[in-house]
């Protein structure tokens, strides 16, 4: 895909990241002023905040074979069945933990929103292509052109590059969907009162788990032979290598989940921490220095928002790239003499990230 085709989009992202921080930073300052609890700003909540107003979400508990439904946390506490824990959260009135908590949280809401937008955009694009717009004629409109740019990018530069032969056709739809969904989820945090669901390990672990399942289902006979048998390797050496390969099957999705989670969480923590320095300086040196230094901290935070916008897309690309690499390794019909070449290709792809 020619780089020139992506330039208008990157220009749009740059302008978007320059404008968006203004209300977003103001919102962060307002939230940080009431509390300097950094982790409290990045953890999941039982509410979503829109225009400064909190909308509390339903609580659903499964306890001893029964489901309990409440409109919000306050209703659950008022029922007498549950009480607030000393370390946070809700437990049963007898002090025992809840068996399964199916409650809807803020991260889950924005996760669903990212999935919904991905489905909506792909459905609208598919409908236009069925009508011949883009297939028989040139794509029309900014959205369809952007859709085609990213789809061709994922297909040609990721799927076709790292999944052997014609097998990439089976996986390009998944890779494009996960790229689009993660991009949306990462970018949500740039909006005022927005939340980044990929800063939740449960979300990233779920996405990595899907890649893990697809990878194992795609595994060829050659792939599993190299996991358990190692053709051409001395039997005593297999005793060492086989456990390492089995562990490697699980460390790959683990690395996918942790990489995305850590990068998105650290960005939010850094922004809240820098804004918190305004109030630290105010408490330590007086209001005059706190207010005077606030200009610098707010400008620095605005620049971090710009960087965070690019990182949001970069992390979506890395997750998609590594997913394609892992699927390609499992789907490859290789022989023992080609194993070293396969490992080298994987190392090169990982080095790009």
Q: What role is predicted for each listed range?
A:
Residues 1-10:
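Bacterial N-terminal signal peptides that target proteins for export
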Residues 5, 17-18, 249:
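Hydrophobic alpha-helical transmembrane segments of integral membrane proteins
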Residues 9-21:
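Bacterial N-terminal signal peptides
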Residues 2, 25-353:
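Selective transmembrane helix interface/packing segments
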């Amino acid at each position: 895909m020619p780089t020139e085709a992506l330039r208008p989009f990157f220009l749009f992202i740059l302008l978007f990241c320059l404008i968006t921080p203004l209300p977003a930073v103001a919102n962060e300052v307002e939230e940080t002023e009431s509390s300097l609890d950094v982790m409290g700003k990045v953890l999941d909540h039982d509410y979503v905040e829109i225009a400064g107003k909190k909308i509390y979400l339903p609580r659903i508990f499964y306890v001893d074979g029964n489901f309990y439904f409440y409109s919000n946390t306050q209703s659950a506490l008022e029922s007498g069945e549950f009480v607030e824990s000393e370390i946070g959260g809700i437990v049963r009135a007898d002090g025992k933990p809840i068996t399964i908590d199916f409650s809807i949280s803020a991260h889950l809401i924005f996760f669903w929103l990212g999935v919904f937008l991905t489905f909506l955009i792909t459905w609208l694009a598919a409908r236009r292509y069925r009508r011949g717009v883009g297939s028989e004629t040139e794509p029309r409109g900014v959205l369809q052109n952007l859709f085609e740019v990213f789809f061709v990018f994922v297909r040609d530069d990721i799927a076709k590059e790292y999944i052997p032969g014609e097998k990439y056709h089976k996986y390009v739809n998944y890779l494009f969907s996960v790229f689009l969904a993660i991009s949306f989820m990462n970018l949500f945090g740039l909006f005022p009162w927005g939340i980044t669901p990929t800063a939740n390990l449960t979300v990233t672990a779920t996405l990595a788990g899907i890649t893990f399942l697809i990878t194992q289902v795609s595994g060829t006979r050659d792939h599993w032979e190299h996991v358990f048998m190692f053709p051409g390797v001395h039997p005593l050496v297999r005793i060492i290598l086989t456990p390492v390969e089995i562990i490697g099957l699980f460390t790959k999705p683990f690395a996918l989940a942790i990489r995305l989670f850590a990068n998105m969480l650290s960005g939010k923590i850094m922004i809240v921490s820098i804004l918190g320095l305004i109030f630290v300086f105010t408490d330590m040196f007086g209001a005059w220095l706190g207010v005077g230094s606030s200009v610098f901290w707010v400008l620095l935070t605005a620049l971090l928002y710009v960087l965070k916008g690019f990182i949001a897309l970069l992390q979506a690309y890395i997750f998609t790239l590594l997913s394609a690499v892992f699927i390609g390794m499992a789907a490859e019909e290789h022989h023992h003499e080609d194993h070293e070449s396969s490992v080298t290709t994987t190392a090169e792809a990982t080095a790009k990230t």
